[in-house]
Amino acid sequence: MITENLLVGNINDSKDPPVKIGALLLVAAEFSLEAPGWVISNRIPFSEYAEAEPLLLDHAVSWVEQHCSSNRVLVCCRAGMGRSVSVVMAYLCCVQGMAYADVFKLVMTRRPGATPLPKLEDAITQVCLLREARAKNKKDLDSGPPAGA
């Protein structure tokens, strides 16, 4: 358990999640999703040991954000130590506004031996920028054209 609503797990956890879980995200490219029907689930494939692609990471963060407010979310990969941890770290930085150093410390305390993906901090920075641009565009669209236009 990383936070009260965010957990990380391995491939076996994705097949038989605890009943306290309401949503499950599988982030392992080499596995198919075999989650039970009672849990909301999705698969966003990341390659093991590769750098996180910012667009994929953004998609995963948005999915976790969408489901985390009303569910405990379990993010799984093969071992539950790399890709799943990286997605949770990105969520905590980009959505919860935590500093990367604080998130890293939290994750290492809660999940000793975790190995975030290479250059994760850079990818998280890109995701935060994508999210900011999206929010600005939405705000601009919602406010309509300027007066006199």
Where are these regions (language model features)?
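Cysteine-based protein phosphatase catalytic domain of the PTP/DSP
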Residues: 1-72, 93-126, 132
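Residues at secondary-structure transition points
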Residues: 15, 86-88, 148
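A phosphate-binding catalytic loop at a beta-strand-loop-alpha-helix junction
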Residues: 71-89
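A charged, well-structured terminal subsegment
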Residues: 131-138
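Positively charged N-terminal leader segments that act as targeting/secretion signals
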Residues: 140-148
